[in-house]
């Protein structure tokens, strides 16, 4: 089994949202880079990073922080959060991310998912959320019409 400790980044800080609610969050003292260092020091080899600013804007807002983490530490890094176009996938790939996680955009736009998989075959992972038996999108705010099974 592979364990991926997580770092959620909002406003350049490590945070934890309560049930995906951006208005209900805990902010931590440690910076994302310091937290990644701590995980590395504890022997973790993998890291899951979510750019929560990116999830809101659809942009690679915290790309510099993520690139810094990838460059400083020998960790397998997977990145998600608002990745809605091939350009964003390319930026994270160029930054050294091992996997790029697609969520809502992959469910809502099958053509995008197909193009992403064709161009970045070994880099794409799906992050799928479910609620009441249906795939959930847009930060748990909407249910799709797609059953989970």
Describe the predicted segments one by one.
Residues 1-3:
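Extreme N-terminal starter segment of soluble prokaryotic enzymes
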Residues 5, 56-80, 111-129:
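Alpha-helix-loop-beta-strand connector modules within alpha/beta enzyme cores
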Residues 8, 39, 47, 79, ...:
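Conserved, mostly hydrophobic/aromatic
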Residues 12-15, 19-23, 93, 97-149:
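Conserved anion-binding
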Residues 28-40, 84-90, 142-149:
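Short, acidic/polar
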Residues 35-50, 95:
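Catalytic domains of carbohydrate-active enzymes, especially glycoside hydrolases
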Residues 46-64, 104:
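Glycine-rich, proline-tolerant flexible connector loops at the mouths of alpha/beta enzymes
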Residues 52, 78-83, 102-104:
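Glycine-rich beta-strand-to-loop/alpha-helix junction loops that act as flexible
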């Amino acid at each position: 089994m592979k364990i991926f400790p997580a770092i959620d980044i909002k406003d350049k800080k490590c945070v934890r949202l309560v049930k995906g609610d951006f208005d209900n969050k805990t902010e931590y003292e440690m910076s994302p880079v310091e937290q990644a260092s701590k995980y590395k020091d504890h022997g973790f080899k993998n890291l899951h990073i979510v750019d929560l600013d990116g999830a809101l804007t659809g942009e690679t807002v915290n790309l510099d922080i993520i690139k810094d983490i990838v460059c400083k530490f020998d960790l397998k890094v997977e990145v998600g959060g608002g990745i809605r176009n091939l350009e964003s996938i390319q930026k994270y790939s160029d930054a050294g991310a091992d996997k790029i996680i697609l969520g809502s955009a992959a469910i809502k736009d099958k053509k995008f998912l197909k193009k992403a998989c064709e161009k970045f075959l070994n880099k794409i992972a799906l992050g799928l959320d479910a609620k009441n038996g249906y795939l959930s999108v847009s930060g748990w705010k909407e249910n799709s019409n797609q059953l989970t099974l």
